[in-house]
């Protein structure tokens, strides 16, 4: 009887932890569950989402890992639009790898300047990069608070957008917690012209993943999921 009484609290604790884990997962939708090209997503040119990628260029999932096609310079963009959401995923780059996450982007123009792009890049991709062009930065607009990127390893990313508030963690470390309305200065595009200030960027749009690694070095993404917020 004493053994039974001792086991009961442990059993209850295990059940409680299991319930907590399920509750934490509630509302999340996995993004890439089936092998092959992801359904509900389109592949476009990297600098203008209105331009489809070259014929035959695809992104594909195998054994739960998403990888881009062989052509450098593409985005994989959701057909669905999102307003307020939490996006979680793991990403692994090689040396000189360059990726990014499109947030609330329209289906035209460059997500880095016409929507928002959270940069994910190996520091060797551009050794002259400004802070806002490093991993965790909102590209050319908002520098991350710290660098916690792990080169050539899996990195865990969590992005939360609700209204004008953006929070982002990488490997469990908070790198962004900002009020987007505070960023009222134009941002320079790659051609030197002005892009809208972050405060004026869309409040609703698509999400996406970028492949811009040098020498077409691969990127890998897994365990991607999204939860829409009310």
Residue ranges and their predicted role:
Residues 21-230:
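Carbohydrate-interacting regions of secretory-pathway proteins
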Residues 8-18:
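Bacterial N-terminal signal peptides
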Residues 1-6:
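Positively charged n-region of N-terminal signal peptides that target proteins for export
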